[in-house]
Amino acid sequence: MAIPKDMRLKGHRTFNYIHKNSMTYHGKLMTFKVARSNPEILLTHKLTNTSNNFRVAIAISKKVSKKAVERNKLRRILQEWLLTNIQKINNHKPYWLLVNLKFGDFRNDKSKLLEEFQNLMFKSRLIK
């Protein structure tokens, strides 16, 4: 199941803001960029819901896999984890999260991918 629209990050201005104003957390398989939310940037993209909630974007480059099917599977795995653990996410401080998967062969090892994703969520204090 996909992430709800009010939890998605879109637009180049949003990503530029995250790259400039974020804390970066590195893992072996992925990096997290966590920034304070800024709803004013969302207004420039004509989004109807500009609430100050937790939002996320998952970016998987072609270096990870040339096949879009495999990249989408990885994205769906991470989105599924987010949706099942949404109650654990720290909502009293609104953040934007950008997840970048690094180059590596982890397509066959779903548990390793999810373990590192959860560890980085704890490390970035998005989950208590």
Curated annotation (Swiss-Prot):
Name of the gene encoding the protein in the UniProt record: rnpA
UniProt keywords, alphabetically: Endonuclease, Hydrolase, Nuclease, RNA-binding, tRNA processing
Organism: Prochlorococcus marinus (strain AS9601)
InterPro entries: Ribosomal_Su5_D2-typ_SF, Ribsml_uS5_D2-typ_fold_subgr, RNase_P
Gene Ontology CC annotations of this record: ribonuclease P complex
Recorded coiled-coil stretches: none
One function term, GO molecular function aspect: tRNA binding
Identification of the protein by name: Ribonuclease P protein component
Enzyme class: hydrolase
Gene3D superfamilies cross-referenced by the UniProt entry: 3.30.230.10
GO biological process terms held by the UniProt record: tRNA 5'-leader removal
PANTHER family per the UniProt record, alphabetical: RIBONUCLEASE P PROTEIN COMPONENT
EC numbers, comma separated: 3.1.26.5
SUPFAM superfamilies referenced in this protein's UniProt entry, alphabetically: Ribosomal protein S5 domain 2-like
Catalytic activity field: Endonucleolytic cleavage of RNA, removing 5'-extranucleotides from tRNA precursor
Keyword Chaperone carried by entry: no
